[in-house]
Design a protein with these regions (language model features):
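Cys-dependent protein tyrosine phosphatase-like superfamily
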Residues: 1-135
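A contiguous pocket-lining binding segment that forms or flanks enzyme active sites
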Residues: 134-142
């Protein structure tokens, strides 16, 4: 098991699934990555570090990566304001936001439908990785 202590919710997404272990990792933003954990990530030797944040989010909290890891950094921005727009639209329309789960379900659907080119690129990168790790993240990891 990979232990990254300085980044929120760093985890292997294969846990509990039929995916191969230790290939695909998800976490919150990497701006808090400390020196110890930078070395851990370097030792993983990931094929790619994919950042789904938009430029405004990156500007506020850039990933703390070594030059070795920066070479593997890929930004595939997905608008973080999508969820905010959805909640605001529900309020404007007079709808009641029934539950957190429903809003998240709708936002995930919108993330897919409104950013097909990003997801296409993401899956292309996964196919090219040839058994090397991929780390992906957004701002806060849910």
């Amino acid at each position: 098991m990979i232990s990254i202590e300085s980044v929120s919710n760093f985890r292997d997404v294969s846990i509990g699934s039929k995916m191969k272990k230790n290939l695909l990792f998800r976490c919150a933003k990497l701006s808090t990555l400390n020196e110890r954990d930078i070395r851990v990530v370097e030792n993983l030797n990931p094929h790619a570090i994919i950042d789904f944040r938009d430029p405004k989010e990156i500007e506020k909290a850039p990933d703390n990566l070594s030059s070795k890891l920066l070479d593997k950094y890929i930004n595939l921005p997905i608008s973080a304001s999508t969820l905010s727009r959805m909640v605001a639209q529900k309020e404007i329309d007079g709808d009641c936001v029934k539950s957190y789960e429903k809003v998240m379900e709708d936002s995930y659907r919108m993330y897919i439908n409104n950013h097909k080119e990003v997801w296409t690129k993401f899956f292309e990168i996964m196919l090219q990785s040839r058994e090397l790790q991929i780390i992906f993240h957004c701002y806060i990891n849910v």
